[in-house]
């Protein structure tokens, strides 16, 4: 079970300013989906993921907003999750969403497939196959799946 640090570190002005500065600069970047074949970059015409990353990754946010939110979560919690929504008819990527949640449980079925059960702020629970997530972690040391949380060092630093 993973619970993001709830000690309100992001409510500290210095912490928020630092994370916001990094996130705003990252929001200016233009990431690209690259496919390599035999060591050479392959041209993929009409690449849906490149389109999403450069314009509107989902109906609710611009590319800059998406990147800023994702990076803010990454630096605040040392874990950031993006949900990949697939078009059920074409099999192509329809949208990508950064996920913000207070609780996450990792589940495993009898055939060792992993699932992430998210509980969102309003109490809604959703279970997603782990393979449909992009999970970026920082300080990936003590846990098999998650980056180490900041709670101990944040409590020490913010109470000093």
Language-model regions, residue ranges each:
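Structured, contiguous alpha/beta core segments that scaffold functional sites
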Residues: 1-160
């Amino acid at each position: 079970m993973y619970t993001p640090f709830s000690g309100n570190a992001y409510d500290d002005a210095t912490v928020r300013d630092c994370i916001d500065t990094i996130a705003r600069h990252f929001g200016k970047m233009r990431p690209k989906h690259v496919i390599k074949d035999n060591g050479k970059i392959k041209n993929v015409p009409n690449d849906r993921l490149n389109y999403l990353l450069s314009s509107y990754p989902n109906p609710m946010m611009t590319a800059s907003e998406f990147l800023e939110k994702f990076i803010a979560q990454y630096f605040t919690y040392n874990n950031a999750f993006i949900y990949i929504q697939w078009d059920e008819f074409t099999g192509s990527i329809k949208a990508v969403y950064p996920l913000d949640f207070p609780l996450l449980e990792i589940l495993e079925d009898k055939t060792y497939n992993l699932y992430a059960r998210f509980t969102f702020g309003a109490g809604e629970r959703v279970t997603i196959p782990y393979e449909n997530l992009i999970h970026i972690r920082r300080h990936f040391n003590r846990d098999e799946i998650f980056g180490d949380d900041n709670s101990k060092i944040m409590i020490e630093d913010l109470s000093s």
